C-alpha cells in the first residue's frame, strides 16, 4: 500500500466525530485559525444544522470558513444534492465560505454546481486531495528519514571577508 492508501485506511476507521476533529486540525496546520484562541471548533455532535466545524480564515479571525466533513467509503460519490444541502446550511448561517471535505469522490454535477456559485465560495476536497494535504502538512504521518544535500555557497566567497 502507498502512504496515501494507508492513510485512507486509517481515516475510514475513525468515528465521524474524530474525523471532523482531524479536518479542523488539518486546516489549523494549513494556517487557518488557532486552537489557542478558540477560533476553531468542531460543532456539537447533533443538531449542527449541516455544519461540522468552523475555522477562522486568518489569524485575526476576520472571516469564518464553515466545514462539512463526510467520512464515506472511498468508492462512493458525493452528489449535487449533498452540495446543495451544504449550500443551504451556509445560507442558514449567513456564511459565504465553505469547505466540503470527504474521503469519497465528487460527481461531475457536484463539482460543476459548486464552481458556479456566485455568492458563496465552496471548495471541494476529495479523499485523494485529503490524503495529499495530510502528507504535505505532516498530519497523521511521521518523517522516517531526511537527507541533507549541501553545495558550495559561492556568494559567501565572493563577498568581502
Model-identified regions with their sequence ranges:
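Mixed-charge (Asp/Glu-Lys/Arg
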Residues: 1-161
Amino acid at each position: 500500500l502507498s502512504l496515501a492508501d494507508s492513510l485512507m485506511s486509517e481515516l475510514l476507521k475513525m468515528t465521524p466525530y474524530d474525523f471532523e476533529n482531524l479536518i479542523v486540525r488539518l486546516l489549523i496546520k494549513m494556517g487557518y485559525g488557532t486552537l489557542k484562541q478558540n477560533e476553531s471548533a468542531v460543532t456539537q455532535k447533533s443538531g449542527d444544522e449541516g455544519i461540522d466545524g468552523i475555522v477562522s480564515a486568518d489569524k485575526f479571525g476576520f472571516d469564518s470558513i464553515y466545514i462539512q466533513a463526510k467520512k464515506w467509503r472511498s468508492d462512493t460519490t458525493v452528489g449535487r444534492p449533498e452540495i446543495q444541502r451544504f449550500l443551504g446550511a451556509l445560507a442558514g448561517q449567513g456564511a459565504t465560505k465553505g469547505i466540503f471535505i470527504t474521503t469519497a469522490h465528487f460527481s461531475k454535477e457536484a463539482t460543476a454546481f459548486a464552481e458556479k456559485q456566485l455568492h458563496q465560495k465552496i471548495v471541494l476536497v476529495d479523499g485523494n486531495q485529503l490524503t495529499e494535504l495530510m502528507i504535505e502538512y505532516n498530519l497523521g504521518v511521521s518523517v522516517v528519514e531526511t537527507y541533507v544535500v549541501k553545495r558550495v555557497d559561492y556568494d559567501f566567497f565572493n563577498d568581502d571577508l
